[in-house]
């Protein structure tokens, strides 16, 4: 069975409340339930974590290194400047998919650059909460090619 660590970065716990015109009205718990449902359909075991702290995300990447076959991460604003998060994902050494609910390339200029994307298998953005489900599907296909 494929094992995936799903990491939600800063402010993602406020889904459904924070800027619903950008991030939608699906709340955080509903998103996690959708992820669990999709994972069950594909027989993928998932562990879901959220933190507003960069160091905690890095600790989880290191802690789950032996357990996880892949990581799905929405780094939030850390996408644009967190070289320590980037380095932790690189050290993970297995597939990483960067996800974003909004299309970061249709937003403010500072959001157009990701320091995470160069160390990721791929990036999925702009599909709302479905970005996470598409990432799970991509991981399933990656391991079942």
Swiss-Prot record:
GO BP term, pick one: chorismate biosynthetic process
Annotated site residue numbers, Transition state stabilizer: 18
A molecular function GO annotation: 3-dehydroquinate dehydratase activity
Pfam families tied to this protein: DHquinase_II
UniProtKB keywords: Amino-acid biosynthesis, Aromatic amino acid biosynthesis, Lyase
Pathway where this protein functions: Metabolic intermediate biosynthesis; chorismate biosynthesis; chorismate from D-erythrose 4-phosphate and phosphoenolpyruvate: step 3/7
Enzyme class: lyase
Catalytically driven reaction(s): 3-dehydroquinate = 3-dehydroshikimate + H2O
PROSITE patterns assigned to the protein according to its UniProt record, in alphabetical order: DEHYDROQUINASE_II (PS01029)
Enzyme Commission designation: 4.2.1.10
Residues where substrate binds: 74, 80, 87, 101-102, 111
UniProt KW Protein biosynthesis keyword: no
Membrane-spanning intervals of the chain: none
Active site: 23 (proton acceptor), 100 (proton donor)
UniProt-listed HAMAP family: AroQ
Assembly notes: Homododecamer.
Role of this protein: Catalyzes a trans-dehydration via an enolate intermediate.
Family indicated by similarity: Belongs to the type-II 3-dehydroquinase family.
Identification of the protein by name: 3-dehydroquinate dehydratase
């Amino acid at each position: 069975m494929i094992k995936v660590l799903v990491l939600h970065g800063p402010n993602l716990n406020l889904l459904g409340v924070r800027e619903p015109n950008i991030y939608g009205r699906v709340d955080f718990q509903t998103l996690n339930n959708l992820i669990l449902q999709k994972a069950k359909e594909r027989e993928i075991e998932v562990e879901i974590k959220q933190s507003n702290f960069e160091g905690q995300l890095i600790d989880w990447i290191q802690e789950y290194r032996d357990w996880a076959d892949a990581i799905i991460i929405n780094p939030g604003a850390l996408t644009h400047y967190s070289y320590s998060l980037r380095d932790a994902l690189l050290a993970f050494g297995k597939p990483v998919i960067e996800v974003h609910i909004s299309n970061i390339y249709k937003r403010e200029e500072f959001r157009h650059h990701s320091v995470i994307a160069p160390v990721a298998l791929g990036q999925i953005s702009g599909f709302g909460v479905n970005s996470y489900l598409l990432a799970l599907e991509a991981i399933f296909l990656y391991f079942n090619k």
